[in-house]
Amino acid sequence: MTAPSPDKKPTATSQRRRSYNTGITADAVLTVALGLSREHGVEGWSLRQLLGELDTSFSVVYRLVGDRDALSAAVVDRAISAVSVPSAERDWRQWLTHLLVQMREALVECPGAAQWLLMNGVATERSRELMEAGLASLTDAGFGAEAAQAYTVAFTSTTTLIAMHDARRIPSGEPSPDHGAMLDQLSKDGPTDPRSSMEALIGKFAGPPDTAEATRAEHYRYTLDRVLDGLEARLDAIKESRK
């Protein structure tokens, strides 16, 4: 198969014969691509940047990994490769908690990976492995035919929080309201008791980086716990219906 050419018009300089680094490996390509993704987002860097970092040609990268879409998939897979499958000895709730807390730790280090997973589903080897293990845990717990829905609800509810934060920190050229702007808007009409509670929460998100990150982690865990509360209630109903 012939590699498609990068989106670049040939020039006299580019047509001159030059020596490229052809001895690189797929692992080296992904290491550089992951580094670019952590800095610019999974979709925020160009092939030209990657080729410049590697000092190689697109045909070499294409042969080793594939096109730009394949590179994105491989980067996301590499980003979540450290997420381990929890012990089967844990009950389903502990199992999902352990998995999804690990998932957050991995995804926040690679902006754009959360959105990629939400849009592409289990399109990488590691995401499929984790999903299959999750379905096994939920099936064993008694969710039966609803195991896939239960896993999807837990995964998407939490991963969306990461994707929302990524949307604010990855430059897109489009205006994106930050929490400071939200806080200003909420305060315009003067506080009331319910609204002041929301102001306090948004104020933490809008605080210094360490405070904001701690708040995001706490909010993620709160969301996860409440989703699992709902799934636990549903599991009780499923078991009751089988009596």
Where do the model's predicted regions map?
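Alpha-helical structural segments
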Residues: 27-35, 39, 53, 63, ...
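Basic, helix-initiating cap at the start of DNA-binding domains
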Residues: 1-49, 65-73
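N-terminal intrinsically disordered/low-complexity leader segments
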Residues: 1-24, 84, 195-207, 239-243
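Hydrophobic alpha-helical bundle segments that form small-molecule/ligand-binding pockets
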Residues: 130-186, 232-234
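Key DNA-contact positions within bacterial/archaeal DNA-binding proteins
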Residues: 48, 59-60
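A structured, mid-to-C-terminal "fold-capping" secondary-structure block
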Residues: 177-243
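Amphipathic alpha-helical segments used for helix-helix packing
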Residues: 76, 104-133, 163-167, 171, ...
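Hydrophobic alpha-helical connector segments
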Residues: 84-129, 145, 151-154
